[in-house]
């Protein structure tokens, strides 16, 4: 009887310890990217980049890593980050050497001229406890799309992008006055979940008058604000195409710049005391919406599908940087 009891106790211990061992084993079998930093492969192609006043020679992939990290939140879905990497690569190769503001370098890190860029060490410091995970997501975005670009009829496109749109992106001709076949207005799925999707800018009457007259001194702003605002024409994408202020017609893009609005997708409410702009989205609205890309990725779309949605009639193909004209 004692032997039977001892055997039963031993069997019970084994049944208890074996699952524990299995659980411990599973806990240590973490994905490699959760424990180690991925290695970013070299593109084999070098660009001269103006960084804080100094020209640096950067491998294309190292440059793109800093662009994706600076231009798109690393918390976004992987397919959205991949789409950003392809758009950034295309934009860089198309733009390199053509920016008049810095003849000593092919590109710069000023987002208003080329693309935003951040050093890896700075980005990791900003990400805190998420540094390893986010570093690997950006590395994967660049590596998984290595050499891939966006082409229209065999040529690199001007792969412009922006933060968020209203219900749709804008046709390039409505914003910049030149028609571009692949920069058409398309639906964009982001919405109120986007930070600061809706914003408001309120100008007291005198401040509105001073601001607009500084930009358009020929305007006539007499009486009260309701008399200043004339007809507003909207684009297919829902942004302001033109608006009449003080008898002067300006484009939505010009009004956005004059009044410092987040986008040209706005409505205007004038009262006797003030003029209020109610704004939707952020950015010029042309090309790929970054928050729209993230929404599409969360819906299960691939980065190729995202890019083909936002850039009409394009293809995503492998491309050697030395092939650019």
Per-segment meaning from a language model:
Residues 1-325:
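Conserved, single-site charged/polar hotspot
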């Amino acid at each position: 009887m004692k032997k039977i009891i001892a055997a039963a106790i031993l069997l019970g211990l084994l049944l208890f310890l074996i699952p524990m061992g299995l659980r411990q084993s599973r806990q240590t079998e973490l994905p490699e990217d959760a424990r180690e930093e991925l290695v970013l492969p070299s593109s084999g192609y070098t660009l001269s980049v103006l960084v804080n006043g100094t020209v640096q020679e950067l491998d294309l992939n190292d440059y793109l890593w800093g662009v994706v990290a600076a231009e798109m939140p690393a918390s976004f879905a992987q397919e959205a980050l991949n789409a950003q990497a392809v758009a950034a690569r295309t934009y860089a190769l198309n733009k390199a050497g053509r920016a008049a503001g810095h003849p000593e370098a092919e590109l710069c890190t000023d987002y208003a001229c080329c693309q935003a860029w951040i050093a890896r060490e700075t980005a990791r410091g900003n990400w805190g406890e998420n540094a390893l995970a986010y570093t690997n997501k950006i590395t994967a975005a660049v590596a998984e799309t290595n050499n891939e670009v966006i082409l229209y009829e065999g040529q690199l496109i001007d792969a412009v992008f922006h933060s968020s749109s209203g219900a749709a992106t804008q046709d390039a001709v409505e914003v910049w006055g030149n028609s571009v076949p692949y920069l058409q207005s398309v639906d964009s799925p982001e919405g109120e979940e986007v930070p600061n999707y809706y914003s408001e800018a309120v100008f007291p009457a005198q401040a509105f008058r001073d601001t607009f007259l500084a930009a358009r001194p020929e305007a006539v702003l007499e009486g009260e604000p309701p008399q200043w605002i004339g007809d507003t024409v909207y684009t297919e994408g829902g942004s302001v195409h033109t608006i009449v202020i003080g008898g002067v017609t300006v484009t939505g893009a010009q009004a956005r710049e004059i009044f410092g609005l987040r986008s040209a997708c706005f409505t205007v409410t004038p009262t006797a005391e003030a003029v209020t702009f109610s704004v939707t989205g952020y950015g010029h609205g042309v090309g790929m919406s970054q928050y729209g890309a993230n929404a599409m990725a969360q819906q299960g779309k691939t980065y190729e599908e995202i890019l083909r949605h936002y850039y009409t009639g394009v293809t995503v193909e492998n491309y050697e940087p030395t092939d650019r004209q």
